[in-house]
Every structure is written in structure tokens, then in C-alpha cells.
């Protein structure tokens, strides 16, 4: 029995010593980890966990670089507003528009489609610049206003200068505003809105673009003083006859 007691005491002491050694090892590990956290600038106090100041500084520096260069704040989308006026005229020689009926009625109804293309002239009516091309979807026939509400998606083509695209409501009974959704050529990056004025439905319309986002000023030949909109407007004879003095370079036809 005495030898058994000695053995049990020996085992117990060995186990306690091992536990003590393990506890000291874990304490040393924790202290080492804590020092490592401190060296990194990271707090190990649970909810007080934080990034090192050097990391925060680098993050702020990166953000600053993204926003500025040479000390100047950059605006990736120029906000200067440039006005551009054009006339859209249907001269009844382009087999446009086409009416694709989906509604079961003689009048326009929801879902009817109207693809179209018309001629485009500068606001001063001195030059032919190109065409419009797009699609109108009938949203509603408005009998009390003797007109229609369309949802329109179309583009304005300006020969070598590029094109502008728009989307929004086209109301045949009152003025409306559409969103400028983009452009190409000199109109790359364009955004803003365009005012549509119905002069003679569906053959004469006047547009005033309020353009933002352009890298450069608009060409002078596109920005002549516009003729006041009226139902009696007509393009200059040179523009209508497509004479060299009456068109822009490589006008879109």
C-alpha cells in the first residue's frame, strides 16, 4: 500500500508539473502574441481591435490619390453645361414612321411600336447634320388631350462628330424632357437632359440639349443662333439640297 501511495503521489506530481508547464507555455505564447499585436499596432482587447495607424494612413493616402493629382481635386465628369439646338424634320421621303400594331384597337394603345428615322438640321437651319433613328413604344392614348404618350429611345447622328442617345417620355400634346444617356465621338461622356418641343405632329420637332460631361467646347458650326421654333420653319435651300455649304462633314444620311 505504501508503494502504491508513492506511485500515485508521483503520478499526481508529474501531472501537476505538466499542467504547470503547459500553463506557463500558453502564458508565454499569449504574451508573445500580445507583443506581436503591439508591434503591428493592433489591439488584442476584443472589441478594441483596430488597424495599425500605418495601415489607416496608407488607406487614406490611396483615397487621396484617387481623388486628387498634383494637389487638385479631379472631377471625372465635367459639369459645364453646353446648349445645342437642332430641328428634326420628317420630309416624308424616308418611309418613316412605321406603325406596328399590338393593341386591339384602331387608336394607339399600350404596346404599339413606332420605329422611325427623320432628318436633322442645325438650330439655325443652315446645315443638314444627319438623322434621328430609334423606337417609340406607345404607353397611353390620351383622348382628353388629343394625343399620345410614348416611351422613346433614339439617337441623333452628326456625321463625323459622332452621335447622342436619349431616352424618356415623348408627349405629342406638350413639351417634355428626356435624359441624355450617352454619346460617341465629340459627345463621348455626355449626360444631362434635352427639351423636346412638338411643333407639327409628327413632322417638325425642336430640341434643346443641355449637355454636360463633354471634354471640349462644341464646334461653332453646330452652335449658331437658333431660329425661334414655330410650325412654319424650313431648312435653308442649301441645306435641303445637300450643297457643300449646307452640310457638315460626312453628314449622316
Curated annotation (Swiss-Prot):
GO terms for cellular component: chloroplast; chloroplast envelope; chloroplast stroma; chloroplast thylakoid membrane; cytosol; stromule. Keywords: Chloroplast, Isomerase, Plastid, Transit peptide. Signal peptide: none annotated. The keyword Transit peptide applies. One of its GO terms (molecular function) is allene-oxide cyclase activity. Induction: High local and systemic induction by wounding. The four allene oxide cyclase proteins (AOC1, AOC2, AOC3 and AOC4) are encoded by duplicated genes. They are very similar, and most experiments involving antibodies do not discriminate between the different members. Involved in the production of 12-oxo-phytodienoic acid (OPDA), a precursor of jasmonic acid. This is Allene oxide cyclase 2, chloroplastic.
